[in-house]
Each structure stands twice: as structure tokens, then as C-alpha cells.
Design a protein with these regions (language model features):
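Active-site-proximal loop->helix
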Residues: 266-267
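Short catalytic/ligand-binding loop motif for oxyanion handling, primarily in non-cytosolic enzymes
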Residues: 114, 262-263
Length: 483
């Protein structure tokens, strides 16, 4: 039960729903509270990313008000809005966000009484739901509750100058919650790797050399020139390690999709840490319930790192100077990134070291892509093979290429698989998953019910469009139990 009045953000078409809100005010129609109203040119201009942002910033609910079907001055903007919000609501529901928090309604310009009734109904529904907490801090606190260890500075490195002239720069490679693919991306440099080793001193690389935490702690603050950190932050121990490297390094680089966006690891937030532990160590797991398995031995106990409440991209824990995207980053991207970061004028400010252009521009299937693909039916790779040499979107197969950065060369498409967005969004796209929900929802065809049916037929919108970016983009409301 909500402890306060629900906060509603209302995106209202200026030609109809916004005019209805004015009409409700002039006629003094009573409703529990006035929502925060935002006038838009058309309901079809309401990007799903704006709805996600409103929920992430603490709104209890979002209302999208558009013209009745057939009345849209942009022909089908209202129907596009309904299709998009159907996809978005289903993705949010996968994470435990109640469908009642997002509502699409058709409201005519002279329907002030209807507007007041809709707001009243929405407020009453939201009152029965848990209160949305204020937005969580952008980064973790300087000390984690289960942390300990040395004192930490909140921001940036602790000082130190670049390695003296004539000495090799010091670099570090470190991993958090990852699969090992980013380590392979460095190995895949091939002949360039020995040259790198000759030009730089590697002080930390768990996959290749033995180094202890105490050795890194003993270094002066800022002694490492560049620290490349891959993997999402999933454990309190990983957050502590990221803070240590931030203090000891002049520059910290988020290396790979998991460090940049949370990666596939972030999809664990759909269920939450309790469900993850239960699936791995619960009483129904064969290796746990095996009567013949050896039991605990008496002696000293060793505490295990704790799972954080949710998965975090690296920049939610420490400031990041640059990003090398990809799952894994491609060899040309890694080569150029290393050269730039070890140069006399390294990039900073969180720069993403990959071309800022859509993958579609270099896609080998681009010649077969219609100017505006139309989605008449959904096709799935699990049930039928795609047509070789033809744009995936034109075939009704979900593909994230339109909103994804170039840089992958593009390996998946050349192997007959659609893009899943591992290189992250192009500038301006914001949340890649929300951008693709907007794009994919807009491609649906037919009347209102047919468009909604097509949008609802996609089996897994969260895993399809937020495969790599769920942790970075979606509201922090993980479930407490299983799905």
C-alpha cells in the first residue's frame, strides 16, 4: 500500500488529450491529483526511453494519452504508441514492474470528464501498489555495508604522475563478473600483443600473471597509467576491487559490454539475487541434495563475497574515463583503443572508442533493407531459418542493428544471426533496449488490435532488446523470488 499519493507523469497529445486536460480543469471535474503533464505533438512521439526514465526517476505511473483511432493527424501515431507501450509493458512485467504503472488511453479534445475519470482510476490502482522508492544514487557509497578494507576516496585516482619519461607505462587488466571473452579479445591481438608487452609494464592480469591484491595496494595512488576492467559488478568484492583500481590508476577503462552496460549478467536482475542463489544452491539442485556428497569439514570458515542487490555497470561504481565496447571487443577496436589510451593525448570523459554510427550503415545485408520495413508477422530463429542475404527486420526477425554502434565487423550478421546490441547504443539513442522497442513497435502494421497482437507476440522483449543493457537502463526493482 502506498504511503503517499502516487506520482503520475502524463504524456498528452496536444491535439486531443492535452486539450481534454484543459477541459477538465475549466469544468472543475474532480480527480485525486493533477499529474505532471507533458504536452507532445503526438502520442507516437513518446519514446519508450522517456517512460523508462520517468519510472527510473521515481514516478509511480506513466499515462500516455492520444487521439482516438482514426483521428490522429499523423495518420497512425497513436497506434504506434500503443504497439510500443505493449512491448515496453511486457518487458517491465518480466522484471516485476506491474503493468498498471504504464497506461495508454484514447482521449478526445472535448472529453474532459473522461480524462478526469482515467486519472482517478489510475491513482486508485497505484495506491494499491508499493510506493516507488526515490532514484538510487548513481554510484555505490564509498563503503559497502559488508566491505571493510582500507579507506577509500569517492572520486577519481589518488594522484600521481604519468610514468616518467623513458619508462614504460604501467597497465592493468582485471575481470569482474564476465565469461572470459574479453581476456580472449586481448589474446586475439596476435602479433600485436608481444609489441604491447614490450611497450608497457603489465602489473595486474589475473588471466595471465600471478599478482596479489596486497601488491596493488602497495603501489602509490595513480601509479597505474591505464586499468582495463571487464565484467559487470555483481559482488561486493568486485566493487571493492574496482574502487582500489580507480584509486591506483590514472585512467580506468570499461572494457567490453558487461563493464559498459552490465551485459548478459544483468539479466539476472529479472529474478533477483535470492532466486539466483536458490537456483544454484537450493534444496532441489541435484548436487546439493545428493546424500552421498561429502559434507562440510570442521575447521575455520571462509566468508564468501555477497551478491549485490542488482548488477552494476562499472560506471555505477567508479568514474570511467573511456569505454571499449563489444562482446567481446573486436581486434581492430582493441588495437585502436590501446594505441589511443597509451598515447600522449588519451581520450577521456567516458568516450566510447568505437564508430558513432549505426551498424546498419555497414551491414552486409543493407542493400536488401527497405527504406521503411513493415512488420506483418514475427519470425523466430528458433522455429525457422532466415532467408539468406535478406535484411532481418524485413523478414520480421528482431534485430538491434538500427540503434547499435558499429565496430563488430559485423560478426553475428555474417554468421547468419541478427544483431543483439553488444556494442551499445549510438549517441542519442540513450537506452538501446528502449530505442529498439520504439523502432520495432513502429514497424508493426494493421489496425490497432492487429498491431498490439504483433507486439504482444514477441516472446521475450527483455532478453531480446535489453540482452546486454538491462542493468544500465531499467528501473532498479528486482524480484524477490523466482519468475
Amino acid at each position: 500500500m502506498s504511503a503517499r499519493e502516487p506520482r503520475i507523469v502524463a504524456f498528452l497529445c496536444e491535439a486531443c488529450a492535452y486539450a481534454a486536460a484543459d477541459d477538465a480543469g475549466r469544468a472543475r471535474y474532480v480527480h485525486p491529483q493533477a499529474p505532471l503533464t507533458l504536452r507532445v505533438a503526438c502520442a507516437g512521439r513518446v519514446e519508450p526511453g522517456l517512460v523508462v526514465q520517468a519510472l527510473r526517476e521515481g514516478a509511480d505511473g506513466v499515462l500516455v494519452g492520444g487521439c482516438h483511432p482514426g483521428d490522429c493527424r499523423f495518420v497512425d501515431g497513436n497506434l504506434r504508441a500503443a504497439s510500443r507501450m505493449t512491448l515496453l509493458t511486457r518487458a517491465l512485467e518480466q522484471a516485476g514492474v506491474e503493468p498498471a504503472r504504464v497506461r495508454v488511453e484514447w482521449i478526445g479534445a472535448n472529453e474532459g470528464e473522461r480524462f478526469a475519470r482515467i486519472v482517478t482510476e489510475m491513482v486508485e490502482e497505484l495506491r494499491a501498489l508499493p510506493t516507488v522508492p526515490p532514484r538510487a544514487p548513481q554510484r555505490l557509497p564509498a563503503r559497502l555495508p559488508s566491505g571493510g578494507g582500507e579507506g577509500r576516496k569517492e572520486e577519481g585516482a589518488g594522484g600521481g604522475e604519468r610514468s616518467a619519461a623513458g619508462t614504460r607505462p604501467r597497465i592493468a587488466f582485471y575481470w569482474n563478473a564476465s565469461c572470459g571473452g574479453c581476456e580472449e579479445a586481448v589474446i586475439d591481438l596476435g602479433e600485436a600483443l608481444p609489441r604491447l608487452m614490450a611497450q608497457a609494464e603489465v602489473v595486474l592480469w589475473p588471466a595471465a600473471i600471478d599478482a596479489k591484491r596486497a601488491e596493488i595496494e602497495a603501489l602509490p595512488d595513480g601509479a597505474i597509467d591505464v586499468a582495463f576492467v571487464n565484467g559487470a559488478v555483481r559482488l561486493d568484492e568486485q566493487a571493492d576491487g574496482a574502487r582500489l583500481l580507480r584509486r591506483k590508476s590514472r585512467r580506468v577503462v570499461a572494457f567490453g559490454a558487461c563493464a559498459q552496460l552490465g551485459g548478459i549478467v544483468g539479466l539476472g536482475d529479472l529474478d533477483g539475487p535470492e532466486a539466483i542463489l536458490d537456483a544454484a544452491y537450493g534444496p532441489d539442485v541435484p548436487s546439493v541434495s545428493n546424500p552421498g556428497a561429502p559434507g562440510p569439514s570442521p575447521g575455520d570458515s571462509l566468508p564468501l563475497p555477497a551478491l549485490l542487490p542488482r548488477t552494476l555497470p562499472l560506471d555505477r561504481v567508479v568514474p570511467v574515463d573511456a569505454v571499449v565496447p563489444g562482446c567481446p571487443p573486436s581486434t581492430p577496436i582493441v588495437e585502436r583503443a590501446l594505441a589511443a589510451l597509451l598515447s600522449d593525448a588519451p581520450p577521456g570523459g567516458g568516450a566510447v572508442l568505437a564508430p558513432d554510427a549505426s551498424l546498419c550503415e555497414t551491414c552486409p545485408l543493407r542493400e536488401s533493407r527497405p527504406e521503411r520495413p513493415a512488420l506483418h508477422a514475427l519470425r523466430r530463429l528458433a522455429t525457422e531459418a532466415p532467408e539468406p542475404g535478406r535484411c532481418f527486420l524485413a523478414q520480421g526477425i528482431a534485430c538491434s542493428g538500427p540503434a547499435t554502434r558499429q565496430g563488430c565487423q559485423p560478426g553475428c550478421v555474417e554468421a547468419g544471426m541478427p544483431c543483439r546490441g553488444c556494442f551499445g547504443p549510438v549517441s542519442g539513442a540513450g537506452d538501446l533496449g528502449a530505442a529498439m522497442v520504439g523502432a520495432f513497435g513502429s514497424l508493426t502494421t494493421g489496425d490497432g488490435p492487429e498491431r498490439t497482437r504483433l507486439a504482444a507476440a514477441l516472446p521475450d522483449p527483455a532478453g531480446t532488446f535489453w540482452r546486454y543493457g538491462w542493468a544500465a537502463g531499467m528501473p532498479a526493482r528486482p524480484r524477490r523470488g523466482g519468475r
